[in-house]
């Protein structure tokens, strides 16, 4: 009696690709790194999440909306063309999304203070008090390490309506 050999398993032409979660922004195929805190981390079926680039953009958008929700310029009282102005540059990620570091200004006031950094610093020290401003500066200098974007996104929840 002839013994039949077991056939060898067929090899796949292409290895199976393990699908990893991707950023929710249309057209972005980077891995999701930041997830909404309401979702479970590590779950393959995340409903939403962002790559680092889009997490930063979304955090900026939400923070700006929160600051501009005051509805008027804190310099002159105007209600049109409002912008989020930072006392300490957005470059310093340790205080970029700190509410004390921002104020709502119209285009004109924001441009005026951007072009005159000494006046802007004096205004910030006057508005916040010198001690608070110095603490913000120290916090900005001291910060090293990755930003916890999930915490920032949780702090400023999504707002459906844009502010002018």
Regions found by a protein language model. Name each.
Residues 48, 54, 85-86, 110, ...:
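Histidine-centered active-site/metal-ligand motif
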Residues 74-104, 113, 119:
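Histidine-centered nuclease catalytic patch
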Residues 61, 65-76:
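Betabetaalpha-Me/HNH-type nuclease active-site subdomain
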Residues 1-62, 78-80, 132-164:
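A boundary/linker detector
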Residues 52-57, 92-95, 110:
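Short, surface-exposed loop/turn motifs that are enriched in glycine and acidic residues
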Residues 112-119, 129-136:
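Substrate-binding/catalytic groove segments of enzymes
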């Amino acid at each position: 009696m002839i013994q039949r050999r077991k056939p060898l398993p067929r090899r796949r032409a292409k290895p199976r690709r393990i699908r990893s979660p991707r950023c929710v922004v249309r057209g972005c195929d980077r891995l999701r790194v930041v997830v909404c805190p309401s979702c479970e981390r590590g779950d393959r079926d995340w409903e939403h999440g962002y790559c680092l680039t889009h997490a930063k953009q979304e955090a900026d958008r939400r923070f700006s909306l929160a600051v501009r929700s005051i509805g008027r310029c804190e310099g002159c009282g105007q209600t049109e063309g409002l912008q989020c102005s930072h006392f300490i540059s957005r470059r310093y990620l340790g205080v970029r999304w700190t509410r004390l570091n921002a104020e709502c200004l119209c285009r004109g006031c924001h441009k005026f203070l951007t072009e005159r950094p000494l006046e802007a610093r004096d205004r910030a020290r006057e508005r916040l008090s010198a001690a608070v401003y110095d603490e913000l500066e120290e916090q900005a200098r001291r910060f090293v390490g990755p930003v916890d974007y999930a915490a920032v996104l949780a702090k400023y929840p999504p707002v459906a309506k844009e502010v002018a």
